[in-house]
Amino acid sequence: EEYILNKLKNYFQPRNSNKDTVTITNLTDYERISHNRFRGFLLNHSTIENEHQLSATSMMSKKIIREMQSDMEIEGYINSINVLLDDLRDNLKGTLPLSIKSFDLKQIIKLLSFKYDYSEDYARLITRLEQVVPIVVDEMNYQANEKAFIIYLYPEAGLSIKEQIRFRKILNDLSIPVIVLTESSCFLSKNFRGLNYFINNVQMITETFLEDSYWNAPINVEKEQIEERFEYLFVKYCSVLEIKPIISNYLLADIIVFNDIDLYILVSFLKHCNLEYKLDIDKTKISLALSSYLFS
């Protein structure tokens, strides 16, 4: 998955795009999407933490400089500082031909540092993320001329479940599209078309799967029901799909389902993905048609 996401990010770059070896197509009209349509950025918690260093290339530094440039009074302050520096140089004794570097906005950045009060919540990663991520993403979008999207890798790292929920809200509130690579259900999309599940670099959650599951269903079920229940079941059980889960309708197990529709959808998807599973089913609690599908 990370390989695919890197390809996606590298395609949508103004320079050094992989557009000559990668093609991205809009499935609505089957036209190729230009590499200039968006600008991709890759983020993780380490990237955000490194922003606190205020390096010359950091988004935080760029944003601070940009905001100072828009402040008319800043130029007057810098001119005053340079006059004082010239006076200081003139007061140096000796005849050496010394000069002094002009003070500018980049010099100000070098003098800045974060001074978090670690007796407060800033000692917690989630608080620093809440403070910095929106600022960094806002600057990314500005640099990309309002065409940015971000890929956030493993946003659950180092966060408790409650903190993951808080950070999910931060990502949801961003003004640009966000793609996450995650092992936590807290960050999964609640919409079928926002879910992704790859096996050997092949997307398994597709409209074709949805259509096939509908037409091949051994029970009476609407297509909308399949989509709705799949969204719920995938988010709930995605973490156990690849461990040969035990599926039961009457005992505690890796996957517990109590109705025919849920049982059919889960088994249909596992078969679609060629994933192994074990059934521990009370056949008296399911329809004969479903029983034939499961055990044939």
Model-derived regions: residue spans:
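Structural motif
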Residues: 1-2, 151-157, 181-184
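The catalytic "switch" region of P-loop NTPases
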Residues: 146, 163, 169-239
